[in-house]
Amino acid sequence: MKIDRKFNFQFNISEPKQKNNIVIFFLNTTQKLNDNYLTLTDAFSQNLVEVKEINCSGAINYLKVTNNSEKKLLVLESEQIIGDAIKQNRVVNSTTLIPEQSTVMLKVSCCEKNRWSPAVANTLSISKSLYFSKGRTSSSTDIFKNQKTDQFKIWDEISDKMKEFKSKSFTGSLEDIYNMKEDNFEEIVKS
């Protein structure tokens, strides 16, 4: 299937790959992508972005993001910012393009219910996994209607997903669900 949107960008969608209740479609293109921006993952790997709590107390729905790059920084809705350098793992509420050499307060939601403290290890990264589609849809609807997400609903949806995947997490972390099922995802990708 080929799609040509208003950005005049073409890509192919692969045939679905499925294992049990997981289906993956790959997007492929031969076109050179616009390179006047960095993704959050790329910026992290090049040490061009800083992500911190907004102050020492923190705020559940905001993170302070500093783009130290000479390029814009593209932060995608549903990306998970994970690690113990922040008080809890967060998921990005909406796609944001952060200007070069600037700092913004990024709207996020908590995706790790039972932790509110940083740790000594001071690790921080971007998850390989995005917030699941049902959760994204629900959050987007809440943002559209109320200009904010319903944090309790997000935690309930993550809890439901844990039950569905038969996974457990001491901190109620969305990332733990994906880590427990990573072998399944890797097997689908390799097939």
PLM regions with names:
Residues 5, 46, 89, 139, ...:
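Generic alpha-helix detector with strongest preference for long hydrophobic helices that associate
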Residues 63-73:
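Asparagine-centered strand-capping/turn motif at beta-strand->loop junctions
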Residues 55-63:
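Short, solvent-exposed loop/turn segments enriched in Ser/Thr/Gly
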Residues 72-76, 106:
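Elongated alpha-helical scaffolds
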Residues 2-29, 80, 84-128:
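Intrinsically disordered, low-complexity Pro/Gly/Ser/Thr-rich segments with frequent PxxP/GP/PP motifs
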Residues 1-54, 176-191:
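Early extracytoplasmic/domain-onset interaction patches
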Residues 111-191:
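Mixed-charge (acidic/basic) macromolecular-recognition segments
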Residues 34, 75, 116-118:
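Short acidic, gly/pro-rich beta-turn/loop elements at beta-sheet edges
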